Amino acid sequence: MPMVTRRLRDPDINPCLSESDASTRCMDENNYDRERCSSYFLKYKNCRRFWNSVMIQRRQNGVQPSMPTAAERDEILGAMQKMPY
């Protein structure tokens, strides 16, 4: 597996792995009809936007690593009581 693909499949690096998988699975199941999967695409886009804003905020505050690990992300989402995306 190429290094780029391996990094994208790593849950510590890609916070929206499940949303990405869901949108890909929807495309496969619906014969690549994009309109049927628009809700999955929107959820993935909102996920990326949310974690990008978290990453920017952490970088501004000097927190390393700028992208929280998978365990830290679970804590953040648990503290919010609901999914922000």
Swiss-Prot record:
Span of the annotated motif Cx9C motif 1: 16-26
Cross-referenced SUPFAM superfamilies: Cysteine alpha-hairpin motif
Chain span(s) of sequence motif Cx9C motif 2: 37-47
S-S bridge residues: 16-47, 26-37
Source organism, top-level taxon: Eukaryota
Keyword Cytoplasm set for record: no
Residues annotated as domain CHCH: 13-55
Name of the protein: Coiled-coil-helix-coiled-coil-helix domain-containing protein 7
Taxonomic source organism: Mus musculus (Mouse)
Annotated gene: Chchd7
